Every structure is written in C-alpha cells, then in structure tokens.
Regions:
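Short beta-strands within extracellular/lumenal beta-sheet-rich domains
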Residues: 15-36, 51-56, 80-84
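Beta-strand-rich ligand-recognition modules
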Residues: 46-114
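Extracellular glycan-recognition surfaces and repeat-rich motifs
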Residues: 6-16
Length: 114
C-alpha cells in the first residue's frame, strides 16, 4: 500500500464510538480526496437516525460508486459504523477516491486498506 495523499479541509471531531474515537466531518464544501495505491479499500462511516446525518457522493477513478450516494441517516442507525467497499478487491493500482457531501453531516470513521 502506498498513500499518495489525503486532501480535505474537514475537521477531525471526537466520536463516542470506542472503536473509532475520531472522525472526519464532511459537510458543505468540506469534501475529501484520497490518492493511494491499493488492491482494495473499505470506507467506514457512521450512521444515525438523527436528522443532521446526511449523504455523500463517492467516485473512484472518476466513476460513481454503485450506489453513487451513501446515506448516513437511517432509521436503523444508532451511532454505529457501516462500511462500503470503495475499491473492491482486484489488482493493485493507483486509485483516486473522491467524497463530496450532498446534504447534512457525513462522518468518515476510517479506511481499511489492502
């Protein structure tokens, strides 16, 4: 794995999840771009039923993820972590992952890299 960069103006804020004590808070124009060489990438995010939890559009190498928008507001959310395979397992290569918040607050808890 080779990290090239993580570019964001999003603040890191404390969370009450013991496994993920801090998170990047994506909202408004504070998105995130990750450049790395990997075989697979998991993106962990927080879900909750509170109305301020929003959504985030994700593209990988310029192509929308399927589904293209992750919703962190869920009637089943209670501050728990969920994940999405932003880069599904495959051959190792350089990837650019872009996260653009579309509404509300979106908390990125961590990255799983292989």
């Amino acid at each position: 794995m080779l990290f090239r960069s993580v570019r964001t103006a999003a603040p890191i804020v404390p969370r009450q999840n013991r496994s993920f004590p801090g998170a990047w808070l994506l909202s408004g124009k504070n998105g995130m771009t990750i450049e790395l060489e990997c075989e697979a990438l998991l993106l962990f995010y927080e879900t909750h039923h509170l109305p301020e939890y929003g959504a985030c559009r994700i593209t990988v190498d310029g192509e929308p993820l399927n589904p293209p928008v992750l919703h962190s507001n869920s009637i089943y959310g209670w501050g728990n972590a969920r994940f999405v395979a932003a880069v599904p397992p495959g051959s190792r290569k350089l990837h650019t992952v872009t996260l653009e918040p579309t509404e509300g607050s979106f908390y990125v808890l961590g990255l799983g890299i292989c």
